[in-house]
Regions:
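Short, solvent-exposed, Trp/other aromatic-anchored flexible loops in extracytoplasmic proteins
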Residues: 102-116
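Beta-strand secondary-structure signal
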Residues: 58-60, 104-108, 121-123, 132-134
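C-terminal edge beta-strand
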Residues: 128-138
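Bacterial Sec-dependent N-terminal signal peptides
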Residues: 7, 17-45
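A short beta-strand micro-motif common to beta-rich folds, especially ectodomain repeats
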Residues: 114-128
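Surface-exposed binding patches on compact interaction domains or structured appendages
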Residues: 41-43, 54-106
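Short, solvent-exposed loop/linker segments at the N-terminal edge
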Residues: 48-53
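Bacterial N-terminal signal peptides that target proteins for export
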Residues: 2-10
Length: 138
């Protein structure tokens, strides 16, 4: 066998062995603990039922550092935190204002004078983990 064939064979063998042994079958990638939330209100912190008078509601993520806003959706519009007009830590539009400050989210709703129920869906992320906050204003 010539030197070139031996080197080519050795290089291919090295590539095959590296490929076989470089990945683990029990890798933890993609297996993230769900976000955990606390609030000063009773019930599920991710489900907010607001009065027609509006107000500010706050919830805190206790197991991830510095989560941010991915998007905020109302029935007529969706705003992404990555858009130029907004910021992934603060989205303000029409009747709502969502602010992420460190691990705490402040959701401020203006008074609902429409007489109709309003809904808001907030997608929160901390990288590869996502969670949802649903807001219903009477």
């Amino acid at each position: 066998m010539s030197k070139l064939k031996k080197r080519t064979f050795a290089a291919l063998l090295l590539i095959v062995l590296t490929t076989l042994f470089s990945c683990e079958l029990n890798s933890e990638d993609g297996r993230w603990d769900p976000m955990k939330w606390t609030s000063d209100r009773p019930g599920d912190p991710r489900k907010i039922t607001a009065t027609a008078e509006g107000g500010t509601y706050q919830l805190k993520c206790t197991n991830y550092g510095g989560p941010w806003i991915s998007s905020v959706a109302a029935p007529d519009t969706t705003i992404f935190g990555s858009s130029k007009e907004q910021d992934f830590r603060h989205i303000k539009y029409d009747w709502y204002d969502v602010l992420a400050k460190e691990n705490t989210f402040y959701i401020t709703l203006l008074p609902n004078t429409t007489g109709k129920e309003r809904k808001l869906s907030i997608v929160v992320t901390a990288g590869d983990i996502f969670d949802y906050v649903e807001v219903t204003q009477k």
